[in-house]
């Protein structure tokens, strides 16, 4: 084989290796994960959503934030509701995950013991009227990243910016775990 052919083959191998490295590096960035979350929401791909969003953590944190806002608004009934939410956090979060799965799979919602608290919290948070419109920015700090996401509330006809905390696991996979400014969003809403 001539030196020119060997150099050409070596060059092609180097280019393929560099392209592979860039691709696999990109797959392990919070920007890629945020794009996959948006893709999962748009295509109703529950498996991809569950891979990139720790739904149990997100819902548990949302319940905590809701209970905190309710308990501090000064109304006695809201303090009682907040206390009830906190005590039932785990089963309500599990039910929210289950309902998300059913919604993404296009299945009919099943009746549950927790229908009333789940409906109350989703209505209170306005989750059913929200759409993700744009990923605005990503600030990566070690094994955590804060992704600013613009969401649109169809009922209020208003845009909000959520600060979503993403964490990297031991395998290098980025996963959304919490909406950092959910309390601010609830107060605005």
Predicted regions and their residues:
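Short beta-strand edge/turn micro-motifs at domain boundaries
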Residues: 119-189
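Structured, soluble extracytoplasmic/luminal domains of envelope-associated proteins
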Residues: 78-135
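Alpha-helical transmembrane signal-anchor/signal-peptide segments
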Residues: 29-45
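N-terminal non-globular leader segments, chiefly Sec-dependent signal peptides
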Residues: 9, 87, 91, 95, ...
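Positively charged n-region of N-terminal signal peptides that target proteins for export
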Residues: 1-6
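Extracytoplasmic/periplasmic/luminal assembly and interaction segments
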Residues: 52-98
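Solenoid-repeat scaffolds in large eukaryotic assemblies
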Residues: 48-49
